Swiss-Prot record:
E.C. no: 2.7.1.23
Annotated source species: Caldicellulosiruptor bescii (strain ATCC BAA-1888 / DSM 6725 / KCTC 15123 / Z-1320) (Anaerocellum thermophilum)
Catalytic activity: NAD(+) + ATP = ADP + NADP(+) + H(+)
Name the record gives this protein: NAD kinase
Pfam families attached to this UniProt entry: NAD_kinase, NAD_kinase_C
UniProt-annotated catalytic positions: 54 (proton acceptor)
Subcellular location: Cytoplasm
Length: 261
């Protein structure tokens, strides 16, 4: 078995958890490698482990989904929507992993095409202003003009991303198993501008109809700029993210705890 481990060393206890995992792997003949930005595109693994928070998991979304590699995301901080809470039972968790005593939870992701480059987002693709000026963005659904937004930007989110930036911008909460696309304007200059919830077969195009450039941000990471009349095209990907679950998790219990924070 080949295991890749991606660690956010800024998180409390991340080094301690890594040491425990590596010790168990070494004792059981498991090949492992620390994954970083330099080697994650060239190395293939049977499974991936992330140690950190939900944000740490986002670093391996593209690799894991394209290669159908299951991911065990171990939480080191506050309660996460996506990560596993193992607490002090890290040894038990890893032995259950080795014995394959787990199940797979699949999450839909968005595939975004920007100038012939393709990016993958577990949470969202954001088209946002580059300056303090508001921007004009045109939304097309399956090639049909739907609406023009004067706003600070637009969030194109998955069901998983409905509890992230989209929620802060006033978007709805959607059960993560649903293969829908959410379109949420950011601070729109119109009381009639509302979020849209679209089916999984829809293709969305967001065109920059402003006189200045806008930024494209994928899962919190800047990837490119759109000049006037350039666009980003988004759809639900044929690839899913496979999350390893060691125990049953109730979405609404997690949601209740997160909202209380």
């Amino acid at each position: 078995m080949e295991v890749g481990i991606f660690v956010n060393f800024q998180k409390e206890r991340s080094s301690e958890i890594l040491e425990n995992i590596v010790s168990i792997f070494n004792q059981n003949g498991v090949n492992w490698l620390l994954v970083n930005e330099e080697n994650k595109k060239t190395k293939n693994f049977d499974l991936l482990i992330t140690i950190g928070g939900d944000g740490t998991l986002l670093n391996v979304v593209e690799k894991a989904s394209k290669e159908a590699t299951p991911v065990l995301a171990i939480n080191c901080g506050r309660l996460g929507y996506l990560t596993e809470e193992v607490g002090d039972d890290i040894e038990k968790a890893i032995f259950n992993l080795l014995k394959k005593e787990y199940f797979i939870e699949e999450r839909h992701i968005v595939e975004a095409k920007v100038k012939e480059k393709v990016f993958f987002a577990l949470n969202d693709v954001c088209i946002v202003r580059n300056t303090f000026n508001i921007v004009d963005l045109c939304l097309y659904i399956d090639g049909v003009f739907a609406q023009e937004y004067r706003s600070d930007g637009i969030i194109v989110a998955t069901a998983t991303g409905s509890t992230a930036y989209s929620l802060s911008a006033g978007g709805p909460i959607v059960e993560p198993q649903l293969g829908v696309i959410l379109v949420t304007p950011i601070c729109p200059h119109s009381l009639s501008s509302r979020s849209l919830v679209l089916g999984s077969a829809r293709t969305i195009k967001v065109e920059n109809s402003s006189s200045e450039n806008v930024q494209v941000v994928v899962d919190g990471r800047f990837v490119d700029e759109l000049a006037p009349e350039e666009f980003v095209e988004c759809k639900i990907s044929q690839h899913n993210l496979k999350l390893i679950r060691l125990k049953q998790r109730n979405f609404y219990e997690i949601l209740r705890e997160k909202i209380k924070e």
